[in-house]
């Protein structure tokens, strides 16, 4: 009875509980690593899937942040740069500008030259807070752009008070000095009286009256 109560040797327990190791190693000596792994099995690593999941979450967050960033043409330099979405908005902006110099940029979201020039234009807007910059998306305002004879992008119009349209020209990043020279010429102190001229052609033209005969 006393012998029956004695604990079995540890080696016998390991050998009995690991038949796979014994049978698999019948031709060779048993590996100590196999015995240790069977005698002391490691608990499952529950935290193992966490790193991949965290990486997926971080990747998803990075993609979400990138998708929420504004596109290049949606970035504005400040309160003196406004997006125009209709002819009425365009006319209202010119009217509300008063005697301020207004620079209108006609651009296309697909235009590589427009994109290259845009950061320089934003810096110019920051350097000239007294000038109002209007951005007109060509694809969103095709009828108005056609009436204003915009045939190439990027294209610029200069307006000021009762003087109306002062200049109209195309400009690229390589020729940006042309725009700065025009600013130096037209952004001078002045006072004007009356509504702006030169912008009425953006609306439907009134019916033309027959020309009167000139006096002989």
Curated annotation (Swiss-Prot):
Entry keywords, A to Z: Chloroplast, Disulfide bond, Electron transport, Plastid, Redox-active center, Transit peptide, Transport
Family: Belongs to the thioredoxin family.
Any single biological process term in GO: cell redox homeostasis
Protein known as: Thioredoxin-like 2, chloroplastic
Lineage: Eukaryota, Viridiplantae, Streptophyta, Embryophyta, Tracheophyta
Disordered as annotated region, ranges: 19-70
Role of this protein: Probable thiol-disulfide oxidoreductase that may participate in various redox reactions.
Pfam families: Thioredoxin
Location in the cell: Plastid, Chloroplast
Disulfide bonds listed in the record: 111-114
Biased composition annotated in UniProt, kind: Pro residues: 41-51
Listed Low complexity bias regions: 19-40
Keyword Metal-binding: no
CDD domains named in the record: TRX_family
Transit peptide: 1-58
InterPro entries from the UniProt entry: Thioredoxin-like_sf (IPR036249), Thioredoxin_CS (IPR017937), Thioredoxin_domain (IPR013766)
Domain Thioredoxin: 61-188
